Amino acid sequence: METNAARDRIFARIRAAQGRGPAVTEGEREAVADYLARHPQGPQPPVDGDRAAGFIAQAQKMASTVDRVATLSEVPAAVVRYVDGLKLVRHAVAWTSLGSLPWAEQGMTVECRPPLRDPQGDHDHGDLVGITGCFVAIAETGSLMLLSGPDTFASAALLPETHIAVVPVSRIVANLEEAFAQMRAEHGRLPRATNIISGPSRTGDIEQTIVLGAHGPYRVHVILVDQG
């Protein structure tokens, strides 16, 4: 089922029930843009001048780990250092945009496809490591904002037990408000899914004891790239 088409049909039925046409008009878009431009933002906590340092500090508070390299070509070596240090497999799925990096030179096998489930595999996952980029990283909270799309499939960040995110330093914004403003400026409309990732998955449902990896990755590792 094509999910974008299904979403459009649902929205069209809602608009019909409201007595409006099936498609959003330019006037409606302009009204929303005008509201967002005029709507005052609440008070914002200060963010230090070095957004990368602020992001690292907050990400580590959320139990993410962070590495930093100078260029994209150094990412495969950084990934291998990380997976070898934890005795993880040298095999991962990744977003299409990362497929051209020199993975094989570092002895890493990377397939650009969504992760597969394997009922016989560890924790019901056939693919244990997922490598993604991100739309922006948020310094205030140490979070990653991912936008879903054909080549930026959210499953790579949600299904494998280890999520590795490649983040250019130039894509670090101050706060969530700036992240959404940048989304509107660059994309104009929301994607099918927007994921805000703040460290590994966790839950405290049972006896208020925090357990990592209950509903998603056990680990989130961020590789900052100075010249992304």
Listing of model-derived features with the role each one plays in the protein:
Residues 1-228:
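The feature marks the mature, well-folded catalytic cores of soluble enzymes
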